[in-house]
Amino acid sequence: MTKRAEAKYKIDRRMGQNIWGRSKSPVNRREYGPGQHGQRRKGKLSDFGTQLKAKQKLKGYYGNISEKQFRKYYAEAIRMKGDSGDNLIGLLERRLDAVVYRAKFVPTVFASRQFINHGHIKVNGRRVNIASYQVRVGDVIEVKEASRQLTLVLEASQLAERDVPEYYDVDHGKMSAKVTRIPLPNEVPYPVIMEPNLVIEFYSR
């Protein structure tokens, strides 16, 4: 197991929020961070601290993306036309692992990454095993026919704790999803408030 995969159990506690809306989140059981000093009262964050936390939360939500890769998303977001914060969310939501997770083909974004790496996903009829692959509007994502009866897939499609966003056209009978448009941040079903503009400010210092 990679360090990033192991860290998923600590992300909620470090942020002090249930960022995926999971019923088994450790935040539901205690309100302090991980480690022996987790119960210390935290002081007011500086502007830098607030920006850093916003970055860590967004990066963690999408599977604890590496700093190098996340910085590349920032660089691309500021090069694009329009609001850089909106652009950043659009890029993250077009990651293949995010799409597979949003379509409810798997229960978590971490499971999505592993599912893709193991070759269970096709994009426009071709197998893609790169979790960071950028999906485009109109692309059709599907679970390979041989993988559609996996318990992981069948259980995920029935999850009641989250709904499929309106910017996807999903058919769980065929285990396929089509990206209909790029969402704005306020359309993305985050269980907690995300602040992409603070992330842009962090990297723009």
Curated annotation (Swiss-Prot):
InterPro entries linked: Ribosomal_uS4, Ribosomal_uS4_bac-type, Ribosomal_uS4_CS, Ribosomal_uS4_N, S4_RNA-bd, S4_RNA-bd_sf
Example of a GO MF term: structural constituent of ribosome
Cross-referenced PROSITE patterns: RIBOSOMAL_S4, S4
Name by which UniProt lists this protein: Small ribosomal subunit protein uS4
Positions of the UniProt region annotated as Disordered: 20-46
Subunit structure: Part of the 30S ribosomal subunit. Contacts protein S5. The interaction surface between S4 and S5 is involved in control of translational fidelity.
Protein purpose: One of the primary rRNA binding proteins, it binds directly to 16S rRNA where it nucleates assembly of the body of the 30S subunit.
Domain annotation S4 RNA-binding: ranges: 94-157
Family according to the record: Belongs to the universal ribosomal protein uS4 family.
UniProt KW keywords: Ribonucleoprotein, Ribosomal protein, RNA-binding, rRNA-binding
UniProt source species: Beijerinckia indica subsp. indica (strain ATCC 9039 / DSM 1715 / NCIMB 8712)
This protein's record includes keyword Translocase: no
UniProt xrefs under HAMAP family: Ribosomal_uS4_B (MF_01306_B)
GO terms (BP aspect): ribosomal small subunit biogenesis; translation
Entry annotated with the keyword RNA-binding: yes
